[in-house]
């Protein structure tokens, strides 16, 4: 008997989506590093990325990169988060390349490389205004580039940036053009071409679609688009040929009853300390499914495949649905299916309380 809630992973669709993105990028002279952290590094997902033709697999989590190297030793891996001092040895062993933005970390990484008799490739990160990681001043970036170029255990692979993850800044020809100019300056300093100018993540895809991507950018770190999700809708672009249902969530109906839609009594805060906004729609048929915030994060980002269903909200273990327009089609024990956003996929792929089913269709 099946167990629910369940994350259904359609590996062929992920492989197809990866191939679509790889082909789109290749037409613009850009390679794709497949970001697998959004699906918690699930190995069948990693393999689908590989089959789809990505040039490397990338994650911010060292255990995910270690698992990849243990199964596919020759697979190139990229560490997305600036490494902690406590994980430098693992970085050298399991990440072929890492993103870096701190001089002290670079010095320590170089020392560990020499102690282990290894070399390690680094991409220096530049903060172009999103205000997360990266060198903020040009002079600091250039000094770090010289440090790496002179280091015995490190190889300066290139420079990169991140846009849209914290500061909501959109990549555009201006800020990515600045990245390319910084790369050219470093190349003139060190007397050779950089292998990589990494122009961000999924949020940079619109520049490929409208032809405004600066020519110097030759790598993107792409995950959510390959993983299908509705991220493209959030960022107001669409990639033709991408499957939107490569991941689906299935949950079982545990209650169906006509109830009021506005809470009765004195309003306070919910279980998470928030003050939700409620709309009085009168009495309607509501359903409870056995999945909640602990399993999927913000359940209001779930998209019912039956468009007659609406998601009201929920709590840590329950999600509340409006079934008024389809009540006759659902009974206790029936399964309700959803596509998801990035947050939902992160939570459900990681949760031990969500079963995983891999479908090769």
Which role does the model predict for each range below?
Residues 1, 22-25, 125-128:
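N-terminal small/glycine-rich loop or linker at the start of catalytic domains
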Residues 1-9:
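Generic N-terminal amphipathic, Lys/Arg-enriched alpha-helix
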Residues 6, 97, 320:
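Short aromatic/hydrophobic contact patches that present stacked aromatics
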Residues 14, 37, 68, 124, ...:
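Conserved, mostly hydrophobic/aromatic
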Residues 17-20, 27, 38-51, 64, ...:
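N-terminal capping/small domains of soluble enzymes
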Residues 30-184, 189:
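Active-site-proximal beta-alpha core segment in soluble small-molecule metabolic enzymes
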Residues 177-361:
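Active-site anion/phosphate-binding pocket segments in diverse small-molecule metabolic enzymes
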């Amino acid at each position: 008997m099946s167990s629910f809630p369940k994350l259904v992973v359609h590996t062929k669709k992920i492989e197809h989506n990866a191939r679509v993105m790889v082909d789109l990028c290749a037409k613009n002279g850009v390679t794709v590093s497949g970001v697998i952290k959004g699906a918690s590094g699930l190995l069948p997902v990693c393999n689908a990325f590989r089959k789809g033709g990505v040039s490397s697999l990338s994650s911010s989590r060292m255990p995910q990169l270690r698992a990849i190297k243990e199964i596919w030793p020759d697979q190139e891996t990229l560490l997305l988060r600036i490494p902690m001092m406590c994980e430098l040895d693992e970085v050298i062993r399991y990440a072929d390349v890492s993103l870096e933005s701190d001089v002290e970390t670079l010095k320590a990484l170089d020392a560990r490389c020499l102690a282990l008799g290894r070399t390690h490739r680094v991409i220096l990160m530049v903060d172009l205004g999103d205000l997360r990681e990266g060198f903020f001043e040009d002079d600091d970036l250039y000094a770090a580039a010289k440090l790496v170029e002179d280091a015995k255990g490190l190889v300066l692979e290139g420079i990169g940036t991140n846009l849209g993850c914290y500061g909501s800044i959109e990549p555009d020809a201006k800020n990515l053009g600045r990245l390319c100019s910084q790369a050219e300056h470093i190349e003139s300093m060190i007397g050779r071409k950089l292998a990589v100018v990494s122009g961000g993540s999924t949020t940079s895809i619109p520049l490929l679609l409208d032809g405004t991507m600066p020519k110097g950018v030759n790598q993107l770190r792409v995950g959510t688009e390959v993983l299908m999700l509705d991220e493209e809708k959030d960022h107001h672009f669409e990639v033709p040929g991408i499957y939107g249902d490569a991941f689906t969530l299935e949950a079982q109906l545990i209650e169906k009853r006509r109830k009021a839609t506005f809470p009765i009594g004195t309003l306070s805060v919910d279980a998470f300390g928030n003050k939700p906004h409620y709309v009085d729609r009168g009495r309607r048929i509501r359903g409870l499914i056995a999945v909640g915030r602990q399993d999927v994060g913000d359940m209001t980002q779930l998209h019912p495949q039956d468009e007659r269903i609406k998601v009201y909200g929920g709590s840590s273990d329950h999600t509340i649905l409006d079934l008024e327009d389809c009540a006759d089609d659902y009974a206790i024990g029936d399964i309700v299916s959803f596509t998801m956003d990035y947050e939902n996929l992160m939570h459900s792929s990681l949760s031990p309380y969500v079963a995983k089913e891999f479908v090769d269709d």
